[in-house]
Amino acid sequence: MRAPGMGFFRMPLFIWSLYGTAWIQLLATPVVGITFLMVVADRLLHIGFFDPAQGGDPILYQHLFWIYSHPAVYIMILPAMGAITEIITTFSHRTVFGYKAIAMSSLAIAFVGYLVWGHHMFTSGM
């Protein structure tokens, strides 16, 4: 909850980084849950999502793994980057140069970090 009169571009940069992280978690976490259910169904019910002998695709597992695991890196680093920015500005008694650019880049990192899992798939084929 923001204080009265606090607009979006007056919030601390830590909050911007948490906002980007929240969107990544909201979009990426269901994928890991679905992947887990598919692996359980594959192992216990012998459905064959990932078994080539049953018509499955092992590359699908790699895609589902990286669709979650690549954004997970940014889930860990974005809040730390926001916290470090706040700590440095607080103890140096200075304002942040390029506040809007840093706020938007936090969201851009979250957005792009979610979309670029494919670069992990170059060696196995897309």
Segments from the language model and where they lie:
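Membrane-embedded and interfacial regions of multi-pass energy-transducing membrane proteins
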Residues: M1-M126
